[in-house]
Amino acid sequence: GKTPRIIEMWPGLYEKGLFGLAIDLGSTTIAAHLTDLKSGDVLKSAGVMNPQIRFGEDLMSRVSYSMMNVGGDKEMTTVVREAINSLAKQLIIDAEIEKNALVEVVFVCNPVMHHLLLGIDPVELGQAPFALASSNAMTVRTSELDLTEMNPSGMCYILPCIAGHVGADAAAVALSEEPNKSNDLVLVVDVGTNAEILLGCLLYTSPSPRDSCA
């Protein structure tokens, strides 16, 4: 197994609970659920518009912005991390918990949002073969993503992307709903700025970017 890590130390017997965030980092909206890590209960939920929208309303516009502006990817990384911090701060205040008790974050997102969250230039996703810099699941410290409104030694778990424009959000739906285990033919559609379609019993998936529907 993995080597245990100390995330935080409290004096005496600590009974105030430990908490996590489940975040869907979408192209248009960032949605977050604050959860009790012991019970799994969702305590508070909130959402905010993704501030990257000022760089482009859809994913390919943002990739184009990165291509045409030196440091454009870093600008988009900075503003989205700031928005996540603001969202976390709001939830902490609403739930009346201490910042250091927020020790885990799970992110799901499409590949462009995935790259920009991690500080990876998404330019390769703007042209065939739409190569991902990494499609692996990742575990990093919150401090590595400049997430300051939670425990600095806390952990971020980023689910794996599936392919070029099929991201961790689709992977999360597949894990949760398990359409491939149904005896019926199941169609799951994520209707978003970057829509995704999953089809089972066997599992097939495909991106459906908004631009292709215009």
Where are these regions (language model features)?
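Glycine-rich phosphate-binding loop and adjoining helix at the ATP-binding site
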Residues: 58, 116-172
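N-terminal glycine/serine-rich phosphate-binding loop of ATP-dependent small-molecule kinases
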Residues: 1-116, 123-127, 157, 168
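Short beta-strand scaffold segments in enzyme catalytic cores
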Residues: 30-34, 195-200
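Residue-level signal for well-ordered, solvent-exposed loop/turn and beta-edge residues enriched
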Residues: 39-41, 196, 203
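Conserved small/polar residues in nucleotide/adenosyl-binding loops
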Residues: 204-211
